[in-house]
């Protein structure tokens, strides 16, 4: 049985990934400081919740016999010394590192704090895993490209981060490659494009426009549209991202910090999405226009051929189908 640690496992992507891993027969531990996590996203699973890292250490010392489907949830920082000790001792085959302090706008206001978590603590986790964990699958971001010159964008595109968050992701990509070269460490970097779907709360700092607008419709609020609404995004449904993580984890390829676009491969404008929502929900969609946000790029669209070639990734669910699934989750 494969053993995994999912950081940020009570968040949007982490919770969906955790549920799929359990379904596939993995033994999963989750660590989440609950700053953006929601334990109810895992409520369908057999959970054993520990309130901090010291309880995790005590639990391991007891050598408790564990049911195969039991998920251990540690409510703490992934960089807690007790967590890192467990990683160092070789407790896991794979770490799926999803935890981060989001997002572009927050990083612009808080560059020091976000760098501490997204860079310094992440390197600490990688260091603890060196020589004891077979592979780290790490969540990078399409934001590393900035305003890409070439669309659809390939991984060979020059990186041009235009926010602290994007720079932090870029820095860890560079470190992952260095760790592979210096320490023979196996780290694969997945550059997520705009991920949306069930489990993403509209008031979360990670939320895409889709989830924010669904939240607004469900609660009788206004749908904020930034700028002229002509910006386009490669919207990637959550099942596709989970699929990519598992394919990368199971791949026989040795990764030396390689980076891969994980996306839908098509782009949709904010205006198109709002128009479709307006047609579907009528007067429930109340649009509030706002200025363009600092640090945001105008267009994103990925070429994911490299991920397809190296570990077989291609999207399972395309945008409009995923949007219907998202409506259903929101019950709107």
Description of each model-found segment:
Residues 12, 37, 102, 201, ...:
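Short alpha-helical
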Residues 13, 114, 168, 209, ...:
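Hydrophobic alpha-helical packing elements
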Residues 59, 69, 76, 215-332:
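C-terminal substrate-binding subdomain of Rossmann-fold SDR/epimerase-dehydratase oxidoreductases
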Residues 147-149, 198-201, 271:
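Short beta-loop-alpha junction of Rossmann-like oxidoreductase domains
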Residues 171, 175, 179, 209, ...:
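Hydrophobic alpha-helix immediately C-terminal to the catalytic Tyr-X-X-X-Lys motif of short-chain
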